[in-house]
Amino acid sequence: MEFKMTVKNGDFIRIEYTEMVDGQVIAATDKDVATEKGIFSEEAQYGPHLIVVGAGQLVKGYEEDLIGKEIGYSGKVEVAPEDAFGLRDPKKAEIIPINRFKEKKPVPGMRVGVENKVGTVTRVIGRKVNVDFNHPLAGRTIVYDYKIVENIDDQLEKLKALIKTFAHMELEAEIKDDVAIINVLWELSYYKEWLMIRRGLADMIIQHLGLKEVDYVEKHTGEKTRAELISPPGKEPLAEEAKPEEQNDGEAAPA
């Protein structure tokens, strides 16, 4: 009898998927699909995505659907708002004085940052800006058409896959005595993005590979190599940051 491997919590798997809302494709791992649907991005990583099952990289309903599926499985899952990006909360809609936005004039659809919250400008009336801090997909049912491509068993391959996924580059790495040793170009120290990525990457390695320590070793080659970093998947860049010194009068936006 042939043994068929099924997905369980803690597994490192690669998946391909297309994400849809109301029949419209909003994300895809296939470059050709993304291009055809007009959602291609130079900053996106295309090809099968690494998922550590149970790590919370996917919405709850999607991740739960993976459990028990065989490697090679293809199918669809429809995820209700409660198990996706949540229901829309009217209390998360606020009115912000327009003078809080110093760098760029707010317009409907703009993503903005206000006091460590990210929201979407929905309306600008006079000197007041309506900002919705709900997730853009809150209240929406999401459909995922996906395929489980492979399971990664080897520890070193898992480490390299985590590095590629979170650092968006391939770095030399090895595992010695329960310690992950990662060689990094010294130029990376100039990038604030890397300072944030390295902490999150180390946490993932220790938690999901069961290693005791992560050592980053600077590599000096004598060549001036400019390392290009991009935002990790799911990160929402702030189009405009509202200044905290000028406070709102507490008025709430209409639902």
Q: Across the structure, where does each feature detected by a protein language model lie?
A:
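FKBP-type peptidyl-prolyl cis-trans isomerases
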Residues: 1-255
